[in-house]
Amino acid sequence: MSVDSLPNQADPPPEDTKGRRNRHLGLALVLITTAQLMVVLDASIVNIAMPHIQDDLGFSDANITWIITAYTIAFGGLLLLGGRMGDVIGRRKVFMFGVTVFAIASLFAGLAQSEWELLTARALQGLGAAAASPTALALITTNFPAGRPRNRAFAVYAAMSGAGAAIGLILGGSLTEASWRWTMLINVPIGIAVALAAPKLLSESEPQPGRWDLPGAITATLGLVSIVYGFNHKGQVANHDTGALYSWTDFWTLAPIIVGVGLLVAFVVLEKVTPHALLPLRIVTDRTRAVSFLAMLIVPAAMFAMFLYVSLFIQDVLGYGPLKAGFAFLPFSAGIMVSAQIASNLASRVDPRWIAGAGGVLASFGLWGYTNLDLDSSYVTDLLPWIIIQSLGMGLLFVPLTLTAVAGVDQRDSGVGSAVLNTMQQVGGSLGIAVLGTIFANGIADRMAELTSGAAQAGTPPTEEQMALFGLVSQTAGTVDAFNVAMWLLIAGTVITFLGLNIKHEALSADGQVPDGGETDADDESKSVTV
């Protein structure tokens, strides 16, 4: 007999039940996006704090970048394993494990008294992030009904992923004013609160029976770690007198990349014959999903380059302090959140490729604006308009790419599918910093050589003031060169996205249907209980 047929005067009106459910979903979304924001911004929050960390803990110039690298290598290398753990064990369990490890590691990082203590804690933060991030995205599928509620949740998630780096710069500048240690310790109460609230607000996924694919886990993890290490090494300064980066032929750049590619090839071969694969190849063989993954490799490469080089330009050329430089990115965070909401509202009415295409055009136009920077540029007239334009474009890009990457993924695979998306974003960011860092350094070196050669031909050695001016002119030239390449990189990603996405907006509509015909836990909650 159906419970709905039993008289019960205490039953709340349907609108009250709906209101409570909406509030519950709202709190669940706050929990998920808070965890994702915490994970994403931690890659950038230390950027402004690094000089203070260097002075306090005695980092050498050669080792200081490992504060970021230790985190990104562990994060990027373990994402696939973290996503699969969520599918097999339960996404909520792995999510709680991830944020707990992240919080504990943040405490150790904030209390670190030496280089190795901090770097070990940063690697542990990456491990926690690799468990929390893919399961956070997969928990949206588990907890939100398909259609408009899920699209909106994905939009907020995408906005947090895109704006996290900018928010990290703002927080980094603010917290560093007190102490660099607060850039780590701020995560502790947030992580603990998220872990404690998760059982009350998030539904658990159905664990998927199966054995662990240990050979696949080992080859994929080592392959990704090797590639991320190689790209990160390429982006580091080899000669601090000239500012030159390591070359692509440097052993510790080239060898890890080659080894990593070889391990990933072996991983694909293993996954074809393994009954319980870490990454079922059906996830990446779908055309639309593959295009979304590829675009997520390219788009962050351009975005993270903007954060790095605009931040350097604002501080070195415009003379902004850490706090002011951080707040200079506040319009980017606001813009990407606004456009992400617009993209969410359009997702059920407009084909994703048109939304992403418009976003790519806007973001590319924003990057073009940075190519006109010079020593006479100001923030308000020469940076702010392009920051806003690029942020609006990025929001329109991230939402459809996130939606199409997870649309139609079977419930049992949504954790690892989310992990692939996060992996592409993480590796793409490392790739962008490495490739565009080379362009940036070469642009500086070429312009400096040109200026010093001209001074030598004039027969008078440049003064100290002239050399300082030459440095700013050269840095600006390198910045412009890097943004030229970033613009064309993003244009290529936009074209690939527009031509490759092959999914209609009906698949993302608010009709309550999951594209693959599966059901979510959130769908189950809306059904009548029978006895």
Question: Language-model segments: which ranges?
Answer:
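Transmembrane-helix exit segments and adjacent C-terminal regions of multi-pass membrane proteins
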Residues: 1-34, 266-269, 276, 288, ...
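Hydrophobic residues within the alpha-helical transmembrane core of Major Facilitator Superfamily
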Residues: 37, 73, 107-108, 123, ...
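Hydrophobic transmembrane-helix bundles of small-molecule transporters
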Residues: 176-295, 320, 483, 487, ...
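A gly/Pro-rich, aromatic-decorated transmembrane alpha-helix motif that marks the paired
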Residues: 163-178, 225, 229, 427-447
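C-terminal module of multi-pass small-molecule transporters
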Residues: 85, 89-99, 113-120, 132-155, ...
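Transmembrane-helix bundle of Major Facilitator Superfamily
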Residues: 2-200, 343, 350, 371
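Transmembrane core module of solute transporters
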Residues: 23-74, 241-416, 528-531
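Short, Lys/Arg-enriched, Gly/Pro-containing loop segments at transmembrane-helix junctions
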Residues: 207-211, 242, 276-282, 407, ...
